[in-house]
Amino acid sequence: MSSLSLAVRDSSTMLRRNLLHARRYPSLTLNLLLTPVMLLLLFVYIFGDAMSAGIGGDRSDYIAYLVPGLLLMTIGSTTIGTAVSVSTDMSEGIIARFRTMAIHRPSVLIGHVIGSVLQSVLSVVLVGLVAVAIGFRSTDATALEWAAAFGLLVLFALALTWIAVGMGLVSPNAEAASNNAMPLILLPLLSSAFVPVDGMPGWFQPIAEYQPFTPAIETLRGLLLGTGIGHNGWLAVAWCLALTALGYFWSAAKFNRDPK
């Protein structure tokens, strides 16, 4: 059997293992998923009338404005579970057992990554369905724009997942992993997810504009709602590629060096 065949076989085995864990212990996934859903309902039904003034529209306009940011926040929330899962594997010694077996070493991490991306996609679909149920519509987007939006969400999920894997590997326990990964769900709060960047204090606008989430959010808005994308599309892709590379090499270096 070739090296590629072994890698695919072992990665598939690790993927099944992680999906079985997620199905057997759904509480963590549900808790992480409920956060974006609750924020969506909170900002629409409690703060919607007040927040919509910031974009010059009504509540229905604010739903459309809010959803792209909440979809990305859903991905960030889901990947926190990945950091916890990786840290748990490291601290409980299962990784040490895998090291003694004749398996493709990177398959352990690849299984976590693919499983997390699949969970992120399912979570995004669920949050999207909730958004549609409360009034979100994207009637002008073409099939190509929908495909591009989906591709960006998958690429963003891949990038954040590799970062979360690295955070899990450097954390001594699951609690620390959860805390270390919190920026993945807090960064959207400092982006254009809830209010436009030009409505923020002048000194803070560059921080909000050029962090990873804002370009991706504005690109999703452009694809789904027809707003201007400008340079945000290239920035979003560049951030995704950079974070994926950073997370991959960080995780690989830590995984290969860690004696646990």
What are these regions (language model features)?
Residues 16-35, 232-234, 259-260:
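Membrane-interface helix starts
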Residues 38-43, 62-134, 164, 182, ...:
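Hydrophobic alpha-helical transmembrane segments of multi-pass membrane transport proteins
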Residues 27-28, 65, 73-80, 111-115, ...:
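Short alpha-helical transmembrane interface motifs in multi-pass membrane proteins
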Residues 1-15, 160, 203-214:
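Short, membrane-interfacial amphipathic segments enriched in basic
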Residues 45-49, 168-210, 214:
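Transmembrane helix segments
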Residues 44-49, 88, 97, 101, ...:
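Transmembrane helix-loop junction
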Residues 21, 54, 139-140, 191-246:
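Membrane-interfacial helix-loop-helix junctions in multi-pass membrane proteins
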Residues 105-181, 228-252:
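Alpha-helical transmembrane segments and their short interhelical loops
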